[in-house]
Amino acid sequence: MSLINKEILPFTAQAFDPKKDQFKEVTQEDLKGSWSVVCFYPADFSFVCPTELEDLQNQYEELQKLGVNVFSVSTDTHFVHKAWHDHSDAISKITYTMIGDPSQTITRNFDVLDEATGLAQRGTFIIDPDGVVQASEINADGIGRDASTLAHKIKAAQYVRKNPGEVCPAKWEEGAKTLQPGLDLVGKI
């Protein structure tokens, strides 16, 4: 089921904050008020997951410039996130919040729970300041994501939000021409 244009559901969870090296509570309200990226992954101490999360960290500075808060989520506990951060070269670079979801509440809310394994699927969600999902990507377990595409999607989502009535065509870049859907464009693209 698509979550596009749907408001995120309530949750409360414990998270590891690598910037402060401490645990904290996170709720759906923390994903509101600014743009957010929520990146679900199957498990800590695994294989593809650390490559994805390191890639996301490599894009973190650019995402911060766009006013985006970044969160990762797995069904591991916040304690396991801390241990992984302390022992993995790739994960030790992470500075964004790592949410633990052992109750599977958030994972179910975003419809990325693999019921057979109890683990999260590889899902990425872009959420606007109102807490509404604007974009999503879900991949099979063996297919890692490319975080470099996030900034492009966020810029387009931010532009469309600020410019009602305009849409961004494929491969749109900031400053490029947009489209204004209407009868005058039907059959002319």
From Swiss-Prot:
Entry keyword set: Antioxidant, Cytoplasm, Disulfide bond, Oxidoreductase, Peroxidase, Redox-active center
Xref: InterPro entries: AhpC, AhpC/TSA, Peroxiredoxin, Peroxiredoxin_AhpC-typ, Peroxiredoxin_C, Thioredoxin-like_sf, Thioredoxin_domain
Keyword Disulfide bond: yes
Chief location of this protein within or outside the cell: cytoplasm
Record-linked Pfam families: 1-cysPrx_C, AhpC-TSA
Role of this protein: Thiol-specific peroxidase that catalyzes the reduction of hydrogen peroxide and organic hydroperoxides to water and alcohols, respectively. Plays a role in cell protection against oxidative stress by detoxifying peroxides. Is important for survival under desiccation conditions. Not required for virulence although is necessary for nasal colonization.
PANTHER family: ALKYL HYDROPEROXIDE REDUCTASE C, THIOREDOXIN PEROXIDASE
This protein's name: Alkyl hydroperoxide reductase C
